[in-house]
């Protein structure tokens, strides 16, 4: 029954890191306009590319990730290799859940053609989510770092993981396409 003192972020002493966003003030505005803008941002972010050799984002990231998995056996640093792969997989899995729920929520709010495209986009993200759930079973994130983590780096797991990642790109492309179609319908609604 007693409120606890908040712990400053720099004294959490937690493994890894915690990220959270909090908004004090409620955003005011036209809900439909805000929803459309959120969908525009989602489609834009999902479509991003980056023209350098160090960082890969957007659709190309799935191919790059699948190819990079082949290098896991030779990477001795946990976070640069196996652990980083597992951590990123958890983040991608969670983002696909959020994308699915976001599009489902919008599809319930806005009937007609917009709803159909949003539902179809949600289905694509749901398929990605299922694939990432399978991927994270193959490459589970564990903390603290397991002493025997090198035993987890097995060729058959790497091949299966790469196969899963290569299935992601066409689903992502389809989801982006559906979001853009929903936005086109928004203009004529």
Give residue spans per PLM region.
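Noncatalytic regulatory segments and standalone regulatory/sensor domains
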Residues: 1-108
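Charged, long alpha-helical assembly modules
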Residues: 87-90, 94-189
């Amino acid at each position: 029954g007693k409120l606890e003192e908040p712990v400053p972020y720099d004294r959490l002493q937690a493994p890894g890191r915690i990220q959270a966003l909090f908004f004090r003030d409620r955003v005011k505005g036209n809900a439909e306009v805000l929803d459309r803008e959120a969908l525009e941002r989602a489609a834009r972010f999902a479509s991003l590319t980056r023209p350098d050799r160090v960082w890969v984002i957007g659709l190309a990231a799935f191919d790059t990730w699948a190819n990079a998995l082949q290098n896991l056996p030779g990477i001795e640093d946990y976070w640069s290799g196996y652990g980083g792969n597992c951590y990123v997989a958890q983040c991608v899995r969670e983002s696909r859940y959020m994308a699915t729920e976001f599009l489902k929520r919008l599809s319930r709010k806005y009937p007609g053609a917009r709803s159909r495209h949003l539902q179809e986009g949600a289905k694509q993200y749901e398929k990605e989510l299922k694939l990432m759930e399978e991927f994270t079973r193959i490459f589970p994130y564990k903390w603290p770092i397991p002493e025997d983590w090198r035993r987890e780096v097995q060729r058959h797991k790497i091949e299966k993981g790469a196969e899963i990642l290569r299935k992601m790109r066409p689903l992502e492309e389809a989801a982006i396409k559906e979001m853009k179609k929903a936005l086109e319908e928004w203009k004529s609604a």
